[in-house]
C-alpha cells in the first residue's frame, strides 16, 4: 500500500490501478478519463487548495481570479458532492466536513493529478477552527496533526484491523507561509492541530444535545491540549496530513480561529468580522501562491 513520488510525477501506489486506468471514473467528481480531456484541463496544476464549504471555495476562486486578472472556470465537477474551480495553475476543491468526506476528495484528487500528468502538486487546506488559548482571528499554520486520542497518527480501520499512519506536514512550506503572513500583517501562530471525530462531544462542547461530562472536565481537557502544544481544533487535519504525506506531496494546513474555546463554545462575532476572519487564510495562501508563480 505504500508508494513514493518518483521523478516529480504523481505515481500510483495501488498495483491494481493500472488495470482500470484507461477507463477510470472519478465517481464523486462526476467525470472520468473517457468523458473529459483531463490533461488539457488540469495538466498545468501546481496548487490544489481545499476546504469544507462549496460556497466559500467558489468565492475564493472568484476572488483569486479577480486579483490575479486570470479567468475563473465554471464548476468543473459533474457531481453534487464536490465543487471544482480552476484559476490558472490553482484548483479549488471543497471537501465537506470530517475525515470520511475529505478522504474521498483526496483520493480522487490524487487520481485526477495522476491522469493529468501533473508534476509536484502542492496541497493546502484552508479552513476555520476553534482556537485553544489563542485569540479569535489567529491563523494557525499547523506543525502536525493530533488525533482524538492525542496521538500523532491518522487511524484507519481496514479489514477489521487498526492501521496508524504518520501525520507529517512540510516544514519548509509552513515556514514560507508564516513569513508571508508577517509580510501581510496577518496574525499567524504555529502549533499542533487536534482533529476531532465530531463537532460537539469530541470537542468537549457544553452546548450539544448530549453532554456526559462536567464543565470543569472541558476546561481541564482544553488546558491539557494547550500544554501539549495544540493551538486549534477542527475535524480533518489527521487525514489531510497523512494522505498527502503518504502520497509524497508537499502540504500545509492553514486555519483561522473563530473563537477561543477557553472562553466559550459558540461563535458569537458580527457577520462582518466573521467574513474578515474567513478571508485571512485566503489572503495568506494566495499571496504565497502568487509569489511562487509570479501571477
UniProtKB/Swiss-Prot annotation:
<dbReference type="GO" id="GO:0006212">
    <property type="term" value="P:uracil catabolic process"/>
</dbReference>
<comment type="pathway">
    <text>Pyrimidine metabolism; dTMP biosynthesis via salvage pathway; dTMP from thymine: step 1/2.</text>
</comment>
<dbReference type="GO" id="GO:0047847">
    <property type="term" value="F:deoxyuridine phosphorylase activity"/>
</dbReference>
<dbReference type="GO" id="GO:0005829">
    <property type="term" value="C:cytosol"/>
</dbReference>
<dbReference type="GO" id="GO:0019860">
    <property type="term" value="P:uracil metabolic process"/>
</dbReference>
<protein>
    <recommendedName>
        <fullName>Uridine and thymidine phosphorylase</fullName>
        <ecNumber>2.4.2.2</ecNumber>
    </recommendedName>
</protein>
<dbReference type="GO" id="GO:0009166">
    <property type="term" value="P:nucleotide catabolic process"/>
</dbReference>
<dbReference type="Pfam" id="PF01048">
    <property type="entry name" value="PNP_UDP_1"/>
</dbReference>
<keyword id="KW-0808">Transferase</keyword>
<comment type="function">
    <text>Catalyzes the reversible phosphorylytic cleavage of uridine and thymidine to uracil and ribose-phosphate or thymine and deoxyribose-1-phosphate. The produced molecules are then utilized as carbon and energy sources or in the rescue of pyrimidine bases for nucleotide synthesis. Required for normal lifespan.</text>
</comment>
<dbReference type="GO" id="GO:0046108">
    <property type="term" value="P:uridine metabolic process"/>
</dbReference>
<dbReference type="GO" id="GO:0009032">
    <property type="term" value="F:thymidine phosphorylase activity"/>
</dbReference>
<feature type="binding site">
    <location>
        <begin position="125"/>
        <end position="128"/>
    </location>
    <ligand>
        <name>phosphate</name>
    </ligand>
</feature>
<dbReference type="GO" id="GO:0006218">
    <property type="term" value="P:uridine catabolic process"/>
</dbReference>
<dbReference type="InterPro" id="IPR035994">
    <property type="entry name" value="Nucleoside_phosphorylase_sf"/>
</dbReference>
<dbReference type="GO" id="GO:0044206">
    <property type="term" value="P:UMP salvage"/>
</dbReference>
<dbReference type="GO" id="GO:0004850">
    <property type="term" value="F:uridine phosphorylase activity"/>
</dbReference>
<comment type="pathway">
    <text>Pyrimidine metabolism; UMP biosynthesis via salvage pathway; uracil from uridine (phosphorylase route): step 1/1.</text>
</comment>
<keyword id="KW-0665">Pyrimidine biosynthesis</keyword>
<comment type="similarity">
    <text>Belongs to the PNP/UDP phosphorylase family.</text>
</comment>
<feature type="binding site">
    <location>
        <position position="203"/>
    </location>
    <ligand>
        <name>substrate</name>
    </ligand>
</feature>
<dbReference type="InterPro" id="IPR010059">
    <property type="entry name" value="Uridine_phosphorylase_euk"/>
</dbReference>
<keyword id="KW-0328">Glycosyltransferase</keyword>
<dbReference type="InterPro" id="IPR000845">
    <property type="entry name" value="Nucleoside_phosphorylase_d"/>
</dbReference>
<feature type="binding site">
    <location>
        <position position="81"/>
    </location>
    <ligand>
        <name>phosphate</name>
    </ligand>
</feature>
<feature type="binding site">
    <location>
        <position position="205"/>
    </location>
    <ligand>
        <name>substrate</name>
    </ligand>
</feature>
<dbReference type="GO" id="GO:0046104">
    <property type="term" value="P:thymidine metabolic process"/>
</dbReference>
Amino acid at each position: 500500500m505504500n508508494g513514493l513520488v518518483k521523478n516529480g510525477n504523481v505515481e500510483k501506489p495501488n498495483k491494481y490501478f493500472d488495470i482500470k486506468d484507461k477507463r477510470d471514473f472519478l465517481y464523486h467528481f462526476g467525470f472520468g478519463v473517457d468523458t473529459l480531456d483531463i490533461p488539457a484541463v488540469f495538466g498545468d496544476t501546481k496548487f490544489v487548495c481545499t476546504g469544507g464549504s462549496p460556497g466559500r471555495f467558489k468565492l475564493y476562486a472568484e476572488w483569486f481570479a479577480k486579483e490575479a486578472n486570470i479567468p475563473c472556470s465554471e464548476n468543473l465537477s459533474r457531481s453534487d458532492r464536490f465543487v471544482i474551480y480552476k484559476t490558472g495553475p490553482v484548483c479549488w476543491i471543497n471537501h465537506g466536513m470530517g475525515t470520511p468526506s475529505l478522504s474521498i476528495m483526496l483520493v480522487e484528487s490524487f487520481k485526477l493529478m495522476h491522469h493529468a500528468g501533473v508534476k509536484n502538486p502542492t496541497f493546502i487546506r484552508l479552513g476555520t477552527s476553534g482556537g485553544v488559548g489563542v485569540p479569535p482571528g489567529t491563523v494557525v499554520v499547523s506543525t502536525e496533526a493530533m488525533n482524538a486520542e492525542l496521538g500523532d497518527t491518522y487511524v484507519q480501520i481496514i479489514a477489521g484491523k487498526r492501521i496508524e499512519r504518520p501525520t507529517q506536514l512540510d516544514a519548509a512550506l509552513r515556514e514560507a507561509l508564516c513569513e508571508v503572513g508577517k509580510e501581510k500583517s496577518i496574525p499567524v501562530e504555529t502549533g499542533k492541530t487536534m482533529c476531532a471525530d465530531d463537532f460537539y462531544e469530541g470537542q468537549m462542547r457544553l452546548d450539544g444535545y448530549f453532554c456526559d461530562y462536567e464543565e470543569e472536565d472541558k476546561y481541564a481537557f482544553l488546558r491539557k491540549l494547550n500544554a501539549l502544544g495544540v493551538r486549534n481544533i477542527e475535524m480533518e487535519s489527521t487525514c489531510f496530513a497523512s494522505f498527502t504525506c503518504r502520497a509524497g506531496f508537499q502540504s500545509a494546513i492553514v486555519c483561522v480561529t473563530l473563537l477561543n474555546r477557553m472562553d466559550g463554545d459558540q461563535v458569537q462575532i458580527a457577520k462582518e468580522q466573521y467574513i474578515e476572519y474567513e478571508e485571512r487564510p485566503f489572503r495568506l495562501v494566495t499571496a504565497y501562491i502568487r509569489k511562487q508563480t509570479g501571477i
